[in-house]
């Protein structure tokens, strides 16, 4: 009987390869006592079943809903601050007094008027709705008033024109408010009832389509009758609040009443008593207080007078005459400050924060003791190693020159200490860059005219010829910078090794090292720096959110005693300027280096140079400073930009008081007529003095004679010594070739160069030199009040023919 044999289609299993896998014992021996990770069971990991997951999600939704409702009840309720509403008309045809009169509904509740200067504010108490509102108003052309009031307003009520929505001034106001950060807002249309019935529906449709660009998916409310005003009030009370991050972590206050007590020594300085409702966070008397537009001050004590606008007043008989319910409360609030005062908290000198903003530099701090023998021996060894590296240095090279010569990616800097000369160099380079082309195009600019209205005397009176000439020169410099970035003509009257003695070459701008603590200016001895800014910011914010602070709670009506305040603050308040105060977080009064990411505003076309004085609105502060512009990259070195370009985001670097982000940033430029023009918008990135801004200078030469991989280059230098000085620096061309200087030829600056390929006759030889630059200390907390904004009738554009 024959045995069964497997066929060709029988499954063949893989043979077991024994000995290739470790056993448990060998694995334990190799582990040397380390235990393997334990796989957690579902119960230990606390995984929930589907039913429990749904129940948990519903509980979270319920908690969020209750938190929103609690916030709505507190804002404007009996235990919270009044609901502050800022009314902003966005068109010149809108009647602001008529709108404010409609909102003063006597049938709804009690109205308390407060008239100061040009502003008309009133408090509306509505016990039936269990809500109280505080209405303020601002014209869109009054830039500081609008931006300051928007910082503390809970809701902004925009009044729109039924036909156009907003005009040019209103559009400019919206651009500034969107850049600063909008709180909760509502749109209302005034005057639509005056149109025929057939046109009202079409007008509302066209208006909704027009405002969709700024306010997508927002509902338009009407404000023409008392009934529509009541519906608007209900909408304001029931809206979900949008938060601004920079104010939610700080205590702030809008002044309802102000009193001034001059000091005995000087009548121009004294104690300022500010009364208002605490908002944001708990107000501590030991913290510093920043009055917007005036600076930082210390508080003496906090009083707790009675609330002058209670939602449910007790013991007050109703007046028979309804007109008696209208009260002028400007003086009553001050009287209440004097009667029934209760001292809530007094400042503790041991715990109170100091007003010191700058470090007092010690002139003896830079001295060192005599080095030890070990340090001397290490220095000798280092010199021996470095002597091997600089073997290619030509004869006559000084020790200073050898310190910054690059080889194989290593470098050291020889930047000087004459920092005042740094500030002048920027202007000198601009003049040198435009010297040649200005001589060629001088006749062309002299024969240019602005338009066909030369004989119009009225038009000529509006044109400032000197300002036009300066603006034309700026446009020319900006165009030259775009066409030839960082290129500079080598001076003939000064040796290049002297003119560019503070510059160095880098083998690679991205990877070559640069010590951020090297050759710092004297101003860096005056500023503060964090060891780890991110961790400090997180710890301060965590303390604000979790730690209970002693002081005035949110919603309390308090009186702050602020010391050493100038009398001009009270005078401006009595003229109608709103007074707003913010409590500072720790370290926010100290000076440091702020880096802000900004992008140029599309509506501005004027050139803006670096180190030009601008007006900053950073969070709750505003100040004047001269920023540096640099590229926004992730590297450790950032190239300086000589102009604020429109095609990319840049980083503005200034000396300013510390502010913890997030904070919005607005850059303005003051014109000759006093108006502030919006230049750029952005946000605060970091507080980091070690961020290096590197200025690049490009020297250019022309190939005179071209061989296979050799070329004779001229016009880059004009003497033999300069060629020898810059010989170690690498060359490049606009067409991508790289090379080095071999030797000088003659005494007129010609030099023999070798490249990695053959040059083209139309190519240009370039040499990159670098220097670290620092901002100018031009910080000024005083910002002049701007003239109401109006759209300029004279176009600031330059004819294209003049720039070609």
UniProtKB/Swiss-Prot annotation:
Residues 1-67 are annotated as: Disordered. Residues 46-55 have a biased composition (Basic and acidic residues). PROSITE patterns: G_BMS1. The keyword Ribosomal protein does not apply. GO terms for biological process: endonucleolytic cleavage of tricistronic rRNA transcript (SSU-rRNA, 5.8S rRNA, LSU-rRNA); maturation of SSU-rRNA from tricistronic rRNA transcript (SSU-rRNA, 5.8S rRNA, LSU-rRNA). Its main location: nucleus. GO terms for molecular function: GTP binding; GTPase activity; RNA binding; U3 snoRNA binding. Residues 81-242 form the Bms1-type G domain. Residues 13-24 have a biased composition (Basic residues). Keywords: Nucleus, Ribosome biogenesis. InterPro entries: AARP2CN, Bms1/Tsr1, BMS1_TSR1_C, G_Bms1/Tsr1_dom. The keyword Nucleus applies. One of its GO terms (cellular component) is nucleolus. It holds the Pfam family RIBIOP_C. It is found in: Nucleus, Nucleolus. Belongs to the TRAFAC class translation factor GTPase superfamily. Bms1-like GTPase family. TSR1 subfamily. Required during maturation of the 40S ribosomal subunit in the nucleolus. This is Pre-rRNA-processing protein TSR1 homolog. It comes from Homo sapiens (Human).
């Amino acid at each position: 009987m024959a045995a069964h044999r497997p066929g060709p289609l029988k499954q063949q299993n893989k043979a077991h390869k024994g000995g290739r896998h470790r056993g448990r014992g060998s694995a334990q021996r190799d582990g040397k006592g380390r235990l393997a990770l334990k796989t957690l069971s579902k119960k230990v990991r606390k995984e929930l079943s589907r039913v429990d997951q749904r129940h948990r999600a519903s509980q979270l939704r319920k908690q969020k809903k209750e938190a929103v409702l609690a916030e709505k009840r507190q804002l404007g309720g009996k235990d919270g601050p009044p609901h502050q509403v800022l009314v902003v008309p966005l068109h010149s045809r809108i009647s602001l007094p008529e709108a404010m009169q409609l909102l003063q509904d006597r049938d709804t509740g009690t109205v308390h008027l407060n008239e100061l200067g040009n502003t008309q504010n009133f408090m509306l108490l509505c016990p039936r709705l269990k809500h109280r509102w505080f209405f303020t108003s601002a014209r869109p052309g009054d830039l500081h008033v609008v931006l300051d009031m928007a910082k503390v307003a809970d809701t902004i009520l925009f009044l729109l024109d039924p036909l156009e929505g907003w005009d040019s001034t209103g559009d400019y106001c919206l651009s500034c408010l969107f850049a600063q950060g909008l709180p909760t807002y509502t749109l209302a249309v005034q005057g639509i009832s005056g149109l025929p019935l057939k046109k009202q529906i079409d007008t509302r449709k066209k208006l909704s389509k027009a405002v969709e660009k700024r306010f997508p998916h927002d509902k338009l409310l009407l404000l023409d009758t008392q009934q529509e005003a009541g519906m608007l009030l209900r909408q304001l009370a029931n809206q979900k609040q949008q938060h601004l991050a920079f104010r939610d972590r700080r205590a702030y206050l809008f002044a309802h009443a102000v009193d001034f007590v001059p000091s005995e020594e000087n009548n121009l300085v004294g104690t300022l008593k500010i009364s208002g409702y605490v908002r944001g966070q708990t107000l501590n008397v030991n913290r510093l207080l920043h009055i917007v537009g005036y600076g930082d001050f210390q508080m003496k004590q906090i009083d707790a007078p009675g609330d002058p606008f209670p939602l449910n007043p007790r013991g007050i008989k109703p007046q028979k005459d309804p007109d008696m319910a209208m009260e002028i409360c400007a003086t009553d609030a001050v009287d209440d400050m004097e009667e029934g005062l209760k001292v809530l908290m007094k400042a503790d000198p041991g715990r109170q924060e100091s007003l010191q903003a700058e470090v007092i530099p010690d002139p003896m701090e830079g001295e060192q003791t005599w080095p030890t023998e070990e340090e001397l021996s290490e220095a000798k060894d280092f010199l021996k190693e470095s002597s091997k590296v600089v073997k290619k240095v030509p004869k006559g090279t000084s020790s200073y020159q050898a310190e910054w010569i690059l080889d194989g990616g290593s470098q050291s800097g020889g930047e000087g200490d004459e920092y005042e000369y740094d500030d002048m160099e920027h202007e000198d380079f601009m003049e040198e860059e435009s010297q040649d082309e200005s001589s060629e195009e001088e006749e062309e600019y002299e024969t240019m005219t602005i338009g066909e209205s030369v004989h119009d005397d009225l038009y000529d009176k509006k044109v400032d010829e000197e300002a036009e000439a300066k603006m034309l020169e700026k446009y020319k410099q900006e165009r030259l910078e775009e066409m030839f970035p960082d290129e500079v003509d080598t001076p003939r009257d000064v040796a290049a090794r002297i003119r560019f003695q503070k510059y160095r070459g880098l083998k690679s701008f991205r990877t070559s090292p640069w010590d951020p603590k090297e050759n710092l200016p004297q101003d860096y001895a005056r500023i503060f720096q964090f060891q780890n800014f991110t961790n400090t910011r997180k710890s301060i914010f965590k303390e604000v959110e979790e730690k209970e602070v002693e002081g005035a709670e949110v919603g309390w009506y308090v009186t702050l005693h602020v010391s050493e305040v100038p009398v001009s603050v009270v005078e401006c308040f009595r003229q109608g300027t709103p007074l707003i105060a913010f409590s500072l977080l720790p370290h926010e009064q100290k000076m440091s280096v702020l880096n802000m990411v900004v992008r140029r505003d599309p509506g501005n076309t004027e050139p803006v140079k670096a180190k030009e004085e601008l007006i900053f609105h950073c969070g709750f502060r505003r100040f004047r400073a001269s920023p540096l512009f640099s590229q926004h990259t992730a590297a450790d070195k950032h190239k300086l930009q000589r102009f604020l370009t429109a095609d990319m985001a840049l980083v503005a670097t200034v000396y300013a008081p510390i502010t913890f982000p997030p904070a919005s940033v607005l850059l303005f430029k003051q014109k000759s007529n006093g108006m502030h023009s919006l230049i750029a918008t952005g946000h605060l990135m970091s507080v980091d003095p070690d961020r290096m801004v590197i200025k690049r200078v490009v020297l250019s030469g022309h190939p005179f004679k071209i061989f296979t991989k050799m070329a004779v280059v001229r016009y880059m230098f004009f003497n033999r010594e300069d060629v020898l000085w810059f010989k170690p620096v690498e060359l490049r061309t606009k067409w991508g070739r790289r090379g080095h200087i071999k030797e000088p030829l003659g005494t007129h600056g010609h030099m023999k160069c070798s490249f990695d390929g053959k040059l083209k006759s139309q190519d240009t030889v370039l040499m990159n030199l670098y220097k670290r630059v620092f901002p100018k200390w031009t910080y000024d907390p005083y910002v002049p009040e701007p003239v109401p904004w109006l759209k300029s009738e004279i176009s600031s554009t330059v004819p294209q023919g003049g720039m070609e």
